[in-house]
UniProtKB/Swiss-Prot annotation:
Protein's UniProt name: Lipase
Keyword vocabulary terms for this entry: Calcium, Hydrolase, Lipid degradation, Lipid metabolism, Metal-binding, Secreted, Signal, Zymogen
Region listing for Disordered, in residue ranges: 31-309
Bias type Basic and acidic residues, positions: 84-95, 103-117, 126-143, 173-183, 240-267
């Protein structure tokens, strides 16, 4: 019996020594963590928040490692002592020993949870606790652990002394103890979960606050670190350098502190122990979300589309043409009809192109001015002299501008269909030579004058391409367009759609054909009846006549720096009488005008596309021309071969009933035209 008492004394001594060792190591861990905290506090405000999290985690890892190591040592000592004391006891005694170990592990878990709570508070308070407070807390927990170990050791020794007859009662007590321990673990797990949620919310708030500071300062660089191991700790490094936001090239970069922790076996054991007890050190998920957002924002780069053409392509519609936002519902899409969207198809195939939106019934002069402001941007100024001469308002609608930097040296390609070909010729003339009448009027009356009328704006157009354009006018306008009944019908339609509730815009608002907000429709009709438009030559119907076209030809000239090209179609066949008759596949509304032109007195004018004679579409009579070849030329009209069985709208695909003209054929035509425009830039580029 004395020998057993001596062994019991040695056991008490070893347990006490272990407790002292645990307390000493805890003090050392706390001192190390405090030293790290004091060193980190020297940084900026942003760094202090992030570094305190790292210090808290490092402290937790060291304490867990120390506790795990000492508990293992204690367990080994107890195991040796118990083996010497019990020797070959019954299996029930072995179960008793195992129960003691489980109880010790529970105490260890309680200690870890308590330490975790301290670290949570440590993180939330941004490392502002004093070293003395930490030491008091550590001493308190060390004392509790020491008392627990003594009590367990004493209980174990007394149980060993107990006679075998008392083992049954001990087993029953052990079962009760197990139930209590399980209940404690559930309670601790619940508390730990609540603690983690609170810690995660605080850390998320800290992260958001840090991001707001970073946005205000605009000088911080975030370096985001992430690890795939769920037990690892993510960290943010906020540097006060005046550099843009950067993300490390490595997917999962690690700091020196992480590397040292990785190599520390004790830290790994502590983290593993925390995992087994459902205890986490940081809210990793919230930081991963921030990391992903930062990486997405950093890696975003503005995509600058590269076009095949250096100079944008501007598509200019003809008489009675509209863009989709202002056209009557009975009309199809102008550029492509139901077959395709020409502008969109060009864009998808690498060509920058735009659809101009100008007056449907206006004169070439007014349309050219509108086209200038459509490209350049601004409020349309028809000119003081021009407005006074024809009796309409000086100013029109305001355009945003599709090419605001348009100026000499910054060129464009102008492609006009039908009357649009005349309009783009008028615009180029105004750019180069301006309007002498406007210049003189401004000298006499003062006021402002648009730069367009001052002239001297050469090298702004790379090429001029016309499709079925009546360069020399058309018999259709001579015979029908200027008849009183036809003119009245056309303008009545414009007047009807000019009411304030209509979205349709014929481009005659400067003539007063737009109902005012406080004006009744009856008042609007009476006012419009007195408009000078009905007898004016400043209209599209006049400019399409042979006289109107001849007047334009006299006022315009070829620019030696521009590539000119014309495309012509015909959709009539010769009869036995020598006249031209509309083909069966001609667009139905054009059969009347096509047959009318086919009966013209001048035989050379009879072949036509339904609206325009072939001879008028090829080139202006008073200007130089050549047959087009594979090699482009400047300063001369290049006439392409006439396209047979192509009527006036086949160039823009508006006839959906024409089975001969397919979508693929239309697409091929426009792709070839666009490629030709790109080739012409080699001749007209000012950067050679």
């Amino acid at each position: 019996m004395k020998t057993r008492q001596n062994k019991y004394s040695i056991r008490k001594f070893s347990v006490g020594a272990s407790s002292i060792l645990i307390a000493a190591l805890l003090f050392m861990g706390g001192g190390s963590a405090q030293a790290a905290e004091q060193q980190q506090d020297k940084g900026t405000v942003e760094n202090s928040t992030t570094q305190s999290i790292g210090d808290g985690n490092e402290k937790l890892s060291e304490q867990q490692s120390t506790q795990n190591k000492n508990v293992n040592e204690k367990s080994n000592v107890n195991s040796i002592t118990e083996n010497e004391s019990l020797h070959n006891e019954t299996p029930k005694n072995e179960d008793l020993i195992q129960q003691q170990k489980d109880s010790q592990n529970d105490n260890k878990s309680e200690s870890v949870v308590e330490q975790n709570k301290e670290n949570g508070a440590f993180v939330q308070n941004h490392s502002e606790e004093k070293p003395q407070q930490e030491q008091v807390e550590l001493e308190k927990h060390a004392s509790e652990n020491n008392q627990t170990l003594h009590s367990k050791a004493a209980q174990s020794n007394e149980d060993v002394k107990t006679k075998p007859s008392q083992l049954d009662n001990t087993a029953a007590k052990q079962e009760d103890s197990q139930k209590e321990n399980l209940s404690k673990q559930d309670t601790q797990s619940s508390k730990t979960t609540d603690l983690l949620r609170a810690t995660a919310q605080n850390q998320s708030k800290d992260s958001q606050s840090t991001e707001e500071i970073n946005k205000e300062v605009n000088n911080d660089t975030q370096q985001v670190t992430a690890k795939n191991d769920d037990a690892k700790v993510e960290s943010f490094n906020l540097n006060s350098k005046e550099e843009p936001l950067k993300v490390d090239k490595q997917a999962n970069p690690t700091t020196d502190k992480d590397k040292s922790s990785k190599n520390d076996k004790g830290s790994q054991d502590g983290l593993a122990n925390l995992e087994s007890n459902a205890v986490a050190t940081t809210n990793k998920q919230s930081k991963q979300q921030v990391s992903e957002k930062n990486e997405d924002q950093t890696n975003k780069s503005a995509k600058q589309k590269q076009y095949k053409n250096n100079d944008p392509i501007i598509l200019v519609h003809g008489f009675n043409g509209f863009t989709d936002d202002i056209n009557p519902s009975v009309l199809t899409h102008y550029w492509g009809g139901d077959k395709m969207n020409i502008r969109q198809d060009l864009e998808e195939n690498g060509y920058e192109a735009y659809e101009a939106s100008i007056s449907a019934f206006g004169s070439n002069y007014d349309r050219a001015v509108e086209l200038y402001y459509y490209i350049k941007g601004g409020r349309v100024d028809y000119g003081a002299a021009h407005a006074a001469k024809y009796g309409h308002e000086r100013y029109g609608k305001t355009y945003e501008g599709v090419y605001k930097d348009w100026k000499p040296g910054q060129k464009i390609h102008l492609v006009g269909h039908s009357m649009g070909g005349q309009t783009i010729r008028q615009l180029e003339e105004l750019l180069r030579h301006g309007n002498p009448e406007e210049v003189e009027y401004q000298k006499q009356h003062g006021g402002e004058i648009s730069p367009l009328y001052q002239g001297g704006h050469d090298n702004m157009v790379s090429s001029i391409t016309t499709l079925g354009t009546p360069h020399n006018g058309t018999h259709a306008s001579d015979l029908l367009g200027n008849e009183a009944i036809v003119r009245q019908l056309a303008y009545d339609v414009g007047k009807m759609y000019g009411n304030k509730d209509s979205r349709v815009d014929f481009g005659l608002e400067h003539w007063g054909l737009k109902q005012k907000p406080n004006e009744s429709y009856i008042q609007y009709v009476k006012r419009v009846q007195n408009s000078k438009l009905w007898k004016s030559k400043d209209s599209g119907l006049h400019d399409l006549t042979r006289d109107g076209a001849t007047d334009l030809n006299r006022k315009t000239s070829l620019n030696p720096n521009i590539v000119y090209k014309t495309y012509t179609g015909e959709s009539t066949h010769k009869t036995l009488a020598g006249k031209q008759k509309a083909d069966l596949n001609m667009f139905l509304p054009f059969t009347i005008t096509g047959n009318l032109i086919g009966k013209a007195k001048e035989k050379e004018w009879r072949e036509n596309d339904g609206l325009v004679s072939v001879i008028s579409s090829q080139h202006p009579f008073n200007q130089k021309y050549v047959e087009a070849t594979d090699k482009n030329q400047k300063g001369v009209w290049q006439v392409t071969p006439t396209k047979h069985d192509w009527d006036h709208v086949d160039f823009v695909g508006q006839d959906s009933t024409d089975t001969k003209r397919t979508r693929d054929e239309l697409q091929q035509f426009w792709h070839g035209l666009a490629e030709d425009l790109v080739q012409s830039e080699q001749l007209t580029s000012t950067n050679k």
